[in-house]
UniProtKB/Swiss-Prot annotation:
One of its GO terms (cellular component) is cytosol. One of its GO terms (biological process) is maturation of SSU-rRNA. One of several proteins that assist in the late maturation steps of the functional core of the 30S ribosomal subunit. Associates with free 30S ribosomal subunits (but not with 30S subunits that are part of 70S ribosomes or polysomes). Required for efficient processing of 16S rRNA. May interact with the 5'-terminal helix region of 16S rRNA. It is found in: Cytoplasm. This is Ribosome-binding factor A. Monomer. Binds 30S ribosomal subunits, but not 50S ribosomal subunits or 70S ribosomes. The gene is rbfA. Pfam families: RBFA (PF02033). Belongs to the RbfA family. Keywords: Cytoplasm, Ribosome biogenesis. It comes from Bdellovibrio bacteriovorus (strain ATCC 15356 / DSM 50701 / NCIMB 9529 / HD100).
Length: 134
């Protein structure tokens, strides 16, 4: 039976690796990445020997592909940085994946905004009551 502390340890290591990769992208990445890159999350198995790194990249599809390719090309360098910073017994093998969650949130917000504008256009007197309460 697994120890309950193992799950907490894995989560802690995932957070530390996420922060360390983000730090590397800010300080150690010499080549400018296309788009705005954010490390969204890191997922690791119990043995901590691999890490799936989910990144959110704001930009068009070409920028996203270029940034993801560049991250994967430099994965070994990032792994070395993690090894030095975190002093882990085994440095995990990094694999980068595009995280679509941020993109989906932005799409939903845009749709909600458009619906709100449409509602106000169909009911012009409805939105002006808010200033009367002050």
């Amino acid at each position: 039976m697994k120890n309950m502390g193992d799950g907490r340890r894995i989560a802690r290591v995932e957070r530390e690796i996420q922060a360390t990769i983000a730090q590397f992208l800010i300080r150690g990445f010499k080549t400018p990445l296309p788009g705005l890159v954010t490390v969204a999350s890191v997922k690791m198995p119990a043995d901590l020997r691999a890490a799936k790194v989910y990144v959110s990249i704001l930009g068009d599809e070409k920028q996203q592909d270029e940034a993801l390719d560049l991250l994967q090309e430099r994965a070994f360098e990032i792994q070395n940085y993690i090894g030095k910073e975190l002093k882990m017994r085994y440095c995990p093998k990094l694999t980068f994946y595009l995280d679509h969650a941020t993109e989906q949130v932005l799409k939903v917000e845009k749709i909600l905004h458009e619906l709100e504008l449409e509602r106000k256009a169909n009911n012009p007197g409805e939105g002006s009551d808010e200033s009367d309460d002050e």
